[in-house]
């Protein structure tokens, strides 16, 4: 299981992450949005998104590349506008082992940031992972942009 979270202007945007092919994923509907101060809203959204898993998702048709689904939930018109001022994380689970991966915006898009990666001990419950993710999101709103 894998999911993406985006934090932009005090809103947490959590799309379903569709599995296109092996390690290729893309954000799809449904998308949950919660205010970063609403811990219970974020928690419900994360549980629901995790329960959906990574449903099989087709490739885009050749030559047709619509704006990513999360753009409209941020109230912007383009992916580049969305990326500016957005922080992003992944939650990954494999064989009941969880990892939160923070990303930083580089020249070629978001890249995994080893300084923002948390590996949880084997057997850690999803509840602990979700609580930590909520704390990270809420802490990120208290820090100046770019830290």
Placement of each model-derived feature along the sequence:
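Negatively charged, low-complexity tracts enriched in Asp/Glu with abundant Ser/Thr
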Residues: 32-88, 112-116
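Short, intrinsically disordered, mixed-charge
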Residues: 47-55, 131, 135-142
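Intrinsically disordered, low-complexity regulatory segments enriched in Ser/Thr/Pro
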Residues: 1-40, 91-131, 135, 142-146
């Amino acid at each position: 299981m894998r999911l993406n979270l985006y934090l932009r202007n005090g809103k947490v945007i959590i799309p379903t992450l569709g599995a296109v092919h092996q390690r290729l994923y893309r954000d799809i509907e449904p998308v949950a949005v919660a205010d970063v101060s609403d811990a219970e809203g974020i928690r419900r959204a994360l549980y629901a998104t995790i329960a959906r898993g990574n449903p099989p998702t087709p490739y885009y048709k050749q030559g047709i590349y619509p704006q990513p689904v999360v753009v409209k939930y941020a109230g912007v018109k383009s992916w580049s506008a969305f990326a500016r001022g957005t922080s992003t994380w992944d939650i990954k689970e494999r064989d009941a082992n969880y990892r939160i991966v923070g990303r930083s915006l580089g020249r070629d898009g978001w890249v995994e940031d080893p300084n923002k990666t948390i590996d949880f001990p084997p057997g850690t419950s999803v509840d602990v992972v979700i609580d930590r993710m909520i704390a990270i999101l809420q802490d990120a709103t208290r820090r100046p942009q770019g830290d």
